[in-house]
A protein has these predicted regions:
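N-terminal secretory targeting modules
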Residues: 1-36, 40-197
Length: 197
């Protein structure tokens, strides 16, 4: 057993943290916890254990938020990008771009003479056991997102111009190990969410 020294202020913050869990239980609502750390590099040792214990107590399942672009390999998901995507990360900021989403990265479809549409293939190493949410925006122009699973179109979404964050929900019954997303230039993708309450 390891003990930690903490200030009264830290203890008070943790009490508020766990009080929110109790309130959520009473309201039958959920709490999302975001963890930024080195688990993406070293594996999910400590945060995985904490997540497991919290889920035993409070419920919920799934991987959670997964970056659409990362310099490490996210657990269980890999991507293949067409040549007409630009990649953004807060670790290597580019002047004029500041919309990274929760995973702190984004990709943006750009004009490309080799292809009219940008495409992204998503490969799941294991099928998700809950619905998939794909987070996006199209700040400067209208767009259209087409999503297919093994040659069957499952979603066709008209996207209004605007920087507001939006998401598409793909029901778990329609998810196969390979999904393909196609869009026009200007669309920005921020992340996938594979979680359920």
């Amino acid at each position: 057993i390891v003990s930690f020294q903490s200030s009264a202020e830290t203890k008070q913050r943790l009490e508020k943290f766990f009080l929110e869990f109790e309130r959520a239980k009473q309201r039958k609502s959920s709490i999302r916890i975001v963890h930024y750390g080195d688990s993406q590099i070293e594996g999910d040792r400590v945060s995985g254990k904490i997540r497991s214990e919290l889920r035993k107590e409070l419920g919920g399942y799934g991987q959670g938020m997964i970056p659409i672009y990362t310099q490490s390999v996210p657990n269980g998901v890999s991507y293949t990008y067409s040549s007409n995507w630009e990649f953004y990360s807060v670790l290597k900021p580019i002047k004029g771009f500041n919309r990274y989403g929760l995973p702190l990265s984004a990709i943006k479809a750009i004009e490309d003479s080799s292809s009219a549409k940008a495409s992204l293939s998503i490969h799941f190493h294991r099928l998700p056991q809950c619905d998939l949410k794909i987070y996006y925006s199209s700040p400067n122009r209208e767009n259209r997102i087409l999503i297919s699973n093994d040659q069957t179109q499952i979603s066709d979404v008209a996207v209004a111009a605007g920087a507001n964050l939006k998401h598409i929900v793909i029901p778990k019954e329609q998810i196969t190990t390979n999904l393909k997303l196609e869009c026009d230039a200007g669309l920005e993708l921020y992340g996938l969410d594979i979680s359920a309450d």
